[in-house]
Amino acid sequence: MLPRMFWYVLLLAVCIAPGTPARAAEAYQVSTISSLLAGGYDGATTIGEMLRHGNFGLGTFNGVDGEMIVLDGQVYRATVDGQAHLVDPSELTPFAVVVAFQPQSSMAVTGGQSLEQLEAALDALPYSAARIFAARVEGKFQTIQIRSEPKQTPPYRPLVEVIKTEQVVHTLSDVQGTLIGFRFPVAASSVNVAGWHFHFLSADKMRGGHVLALTTGDGQALVQEISDLRITFPASGPASSASPESIKAVERAGAKSSE
């Protein structure tokens, strides 16, 4: 008998510009941003299973119990106090995306850039906008605003409502660390966040969260182009189509300008 929470797997090929040379890379994703936004907070994929598909990524945990950071094959939970903690591989995730990170290009990061300016610089790299990208940004940050949220209990509210009323924001100054980010094309906006989505982990592995705003110091960005996406879909859960407005409300809610 199939388990109650049976999950289907779909392999999605992301469009590739004709004649664009690139090493094939596949990302793995648990569920979709549409499901998460609608309150699909109970997953059946373990952290250990997720790590079979990649060593670099981001997401959350069952009940939206903090922000997930995957770096160098280690998984951390950023809790509402802004602290980061290693996670047991038996824990479950309702939403995550990972890749076996193998950067193909690098870019120097100069000091004084806002999050939007950093994203624009990454977007200017000579790749196809129809593809997915992963970016690892190492360096010092003059300031960085990070957030997390407390674990939810059923009946679950939509994520926009949770973030609006329960997110906790912390501002760090002069901190060394790593941004873990993915960029999805607009055509995949119901699958994952269209545009850039970053989580942060400090160099001492003690602080972290979802990035709302920042001002860069000097650093370096490593970028990987991704041609394919494998998704594990839930067999049941809330149905929803993610609007650009709802995604923006979740991604940058409460962010303050650092310029």
Q: What are these language model-derived features?
A:
Residues 119-181, 189-191:
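Long, positively charged binding patches that form subdomain-scale interaction surfaces
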Residues 193-201:
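Histidine-centered divalent-metal-coordination microenvironment in nucleic-acid enzymes
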Residues 1-9:
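Bacterial N-terminal signal peptides that target proteins for export
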Residues 22-24:
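Boundary at the C-terminal end of the N-terminal hydrophobic targeting segment
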Residues 202-245:
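A hydrophobic, small-residue-rich beta->alpha segment in the mid-to-C-terminal subdomain
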Residues 35-96:
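N-terminal low-complexity or amphipathic/hydrophobic leaders
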Residues 78-125:
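A glycine-rich, hydrophobic loop/mini-helix early in the fold
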Residues 8-17:
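Bacterial N-terminal signal peptides
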